[in-house]
Amino acid sequence: MAITFSVPGDPVPQPRPRITVRGRHGHAYVPKDHAIHAYRQAVAIAARAAGLVEATAPVSVIVDAVFARPKSHLTKSGVKASAPALPRPDVDNLGKAVLDALQEVMGDDTNVSRLLVEKSWGT
């Protein structure tokens, strides 16, 4: 059974955590105003709406991250030669953000046996 869903807007990669030290103990956190929190919530809502439930067997996750191309990459005749071929965020951070969001819906992500992440520019 395949469940497909999409999340509007540009994908948000998992950021590096900030570290704070209190006494001898360090604490890692992501600031509350970071866009990743809204993105995770949007992914979880879309997954639930598509019918995703808790995973009890191995699952495959395919992430197709499509980014809007900035106007600065374009000319009247098409894409500038100097424009990057691929969007900036690393695919591992994009995959991590989606898996963290899906944990709210399907439980622990240890049931994910295959993760395929692709990134590209949209039209």
Locate the predicted segments by residue.
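Acidic, proline/glycine-enriched N-terminal capping motif
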Residues: M1-T123
